[in-house]
Amino acid sequence: MTPDRLPTVFTRTEALAAGVSAGELRGPRYRKVFHNVHARSEVAHETHVRALAALVIGPDAALVARQTAAELLGGVVPPDVRVHLALPTGRLRARGIRAVRRRVTHAAVIGGVRVTTAEDTFVDLAADLSLVDLVVLGDSLVSKGRATSHSMVAAAAEGAGPVGELARRAAGLVRAGVDSPMESRLRMLLVLAGLPEPLVNHIEYDDWGRWVRRYDLSFPERRLAIEYDGRQHAESQRQWERDVDPREELDLDGWRIVVVLAKGIYREPGRTLDRVVAAMRAAGVRGSIRSTEWRLHFPGQ
C-alpha cells in the first residue's frame, strides 16, 4: 500500500507500512483523530471521520450509537464531542469515546459507517435527552425519512422504567412533516401548556386545487395559524421584532396568523402562550393554559 491508497481513517501501523514516516504523520498532511488513529487533513466531515476512527478502535461488532448515530442519520441533537458506540460484549476505554453495552439486532449504514437504526437511536437517547429534545430528534429523523412516527411508537413500546416511559411519551408526540427544530419546540410549548395541539404543516389550496400556502401549525377549521419565523430583518433584528406583533392583525385570505420568533420560545415563552390563547379566543378555538409543565422545559429569562 502507498500513502495515496490509505483509507479515510487509518492506524499508525497502517500509515508506517504505507511509507508514511512518523514525522510526516505529525505534519500538516495528516491529523490525529484518536490515539494511534489518523486521517488526512483535507477530510472535512468531522463527525463522520470521528465515527469511522472510533470503529477502528472498537471491536468488529461495534456500532456507532446515541448522539453520534443521530447526527449521522440527519437528526437534531444537542452537541456532544464524544463518539458513542454500542458494544454487544466487552468494554472499551478511550479518550473521546463513550462505549455502552447494548445488543443490537438491526443496523443502518450511513456513508460506510454502521450505526444503530433511527428507532433504536431514538429509544437509546431517552436516557440522555429531555422530553422536548427527544421530540425534536424524533421529528427530525422522520423528516429525513429515516423512520416514521408509527415506527417510533412501536420501537418505544417495550421500554421499561422512567426512561421507557419518557421514550413512549416522546414517540407519541413525534409528527411527520415538521420543517425545523424550532417548529417542534413551538409545538411542544403549546402542548405542554395544555393547549389543544395544532395541525402540523397544513396546506391550503384555492378553489382550483392549486397550492396557496403551507402553515407551520394551524387550526384550519378556524383559519388560525401559528408560524415560527427565524428570518433576519433587512435592517436589524430589533426592527424585525418590532414588526412582528402588528402582523398578527393582518389576516391572509381570512386567516389570523400569530408569528413567533426565537425570543418567543427561549426568552418570552409565557408571553407567546398569552398571544396564542388570545388569538385562539378571537378565532373561536376553545382552549386555555391548563398545565405548568411548560415552565420546566421553557423557563425563559
Give the label of every model feature segment.
Residues 14, 142-301:
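Surface segments flanking catalytic/ligand-binding clefts of nucleic-acid enzymes
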